């Protein structure tokens, strides 16, 4: 009976009920012969739960290969060189041996099979009985890559990509349809487990008859080609002999049997391996984009109404519904949202009714992107668990089947689509940070998020915004498709080809750029959080100071009688509540700044309604203005500086609201674990130094835990519609 599914929802499987491991007929008899149901079932549940599973799998110490259950997170873990051991299922040994034996038997019987007795591609009309020599020549002529003088020339694939390719190729060959010895697969696994990585060329594959050229260099190490090189555990280049010694492979180099060279090179493993790594990161970045959009709402004092479930339920798209629900969860109970609600109650008719698109439509923007990432992820997981060489050996029917599973179109299409997604996420981040640094839009934060005392000598995130524009422009360029640039190749035999690896490489570039953007934006959001904290303390100090000065100066007349100006205090406090503190904080008593102008305006307005009392020195409010302002000038700058000093020392009276928010784990990670601090022009440290800390942490997978911690108590459903 056929095995349906693999735990990843890929719907891959193989039958093993016939003794030789190849129950091909059974593949067509199960209840989902077209695999559509399996593909649909793979998308059940939330995207966040899927990312949680990926993160858990990524940390497991062992990856056990049996041919049909490999996940992109396992590929990413092995590729990253983590302490992960690769094991091969002993159950696969029998079916792998059966297909290998079939090739040798058919060769002995004189059966004519492509790549076993024939030439390759457009020259398959040629025939030979020297099956081993044919495989050796295959590897030789495919070693057509260019490496330059060394790694500094940038013409080699990253070792992580090669490790991913090795893992995927072993997995696909374990299904027993390829005619290769189990011992060769064990040797590749030994190279992986001992961190010995063949050097592959960066370019030279069209991912049509598989990734022929790069995969031939893995085969070159296994057969001991003199031009083959590997990177040892210590990072040095070694030849094939030393590679075998370091990997503990005994018995010497392999003498290829018929079909074995073709089995190694005629597959999509390099493209699908890199695609797996790319999608592992893309899935995490998608969740990050949802969470930081919610943090953006917090620091912008946005209106959380945009996450209301009814809005998104009526749109029907699951990605949008989930994105909104995640943001709703972050914002529900947020201390920032409670404060923002009070602010919005002040003069509501004088403020915009709704937020700009970068905030208000972020679920609608991100939702379809998440759906595409999920679809691409499942497509690649099907690919890395597929049999993708040619011909396929069907032992049960005693035949070699000539087809084209080596065509890497699922990779090219998935990577083109993923790159569009990454560009769109980057565009949203750029729109959000552009609002955040602009004091015309950011609801009272200082221009450029400048954190210092003197805005004329502190330009904050101005350089960062320029860098973000650069990143975003390059990212949008990379969004252009690769797969429409096909060239007919190999004497017009490979006249359509997927360009899967090229597309995956471009998508890997896009991931790196989006991580640069994410790192920059995350530090900017933390800066905004701290500025809101400073703002709240400054405003409290200003209100207290103005109130105290008003009581001292405006309450009593010269002879101790109650003065009409005592009624001004309430309106003076309203001015402070309505005025952005950073509009005057660098010089709070400046006559050119709005605070002093509007405080004076309050006194003038009260004086104008004071009537005949203004004619008397003892009851004139006008006569109090100078005394009030002089007292304020003597007191307020000291109080403002005191708040600044307390902020620098971490001793402010009002604590930082972020500690009461579900977004706190990300803030804490940046500020405390990474030590990326509050930026000001008064410090020597540059913005890029702090951005780099976050970028390095992302590359080291350290952001995953604090990101998921922000959503640890989400139950996977939107809040009820009440």
Swiss-Prot record:
(E)-cinnamate binds at residues 266, 354, 360, 390, 462, 490, 493. Its EC number is 4.3.1.25. SUPFAM superfamilies: L-aspartase-like. InterPro entries: Aromatic_Lyase, Fumarase/histidase_N, L-Aspartase-like, Phe/His_NH3-lyase_AS, Phe_NH3-lyase, Phe_NH3-lyase_shielding_dom_sf. Optimum temperature is 50 degrees Celsius. Disulfide bonds: none annotated. Contains an active site 4-methylidene-imidazol-5-one (MIO), which is formed autocatalytically by cyclization and dehydration of residues Ser-Ser-Gly. Keywords: Cytoplasm, Lyase, Phenylalanine catabolism, Phenylpropanoid metabolism. One of its GO terms (cellular component) is cytoplasm. It is found in: Cytoplasm. There is a cross-link at residues 208-210 (5-imidazolinone (Ser-Gly)). Inhibited by zinc ions Zn(2+), but slightly promoted by magnesium Mg(2+) and calcium Ca(2+) ions. Keeps approximately 82 percent and 37 percent of enzymatic activity after 240 minutes of treatment at 60 and 70 degrees Celsius, respectively. Repressed deamination activity by beta-mercaptoethanol. Pathway: Phenylpropanoid metabolism; trans-cinnamate biosynthesis; trans-cinnamate from L-phenylalanine: step 1/1. The keyword Ligase does not apply. One of its GO terms (molecular function) is phenylalanine ammonia-lyase activity. The modification 2,3-didehydroalanine (Ser) is found at residue 209. At the reproductive stage, mostly expressed in leaves and florets, and, to a lower extent, in bulbus and stems. It catalyses: L-tyrosine = (E)-4-coumarate + NH4(+); L-phenylalanine = (E)-cinnamate + NH4(+). Homotetramer. Belongs to the PAL/histidase family. This is Phenylalanine/tyrosine ammonia-lyase 1.
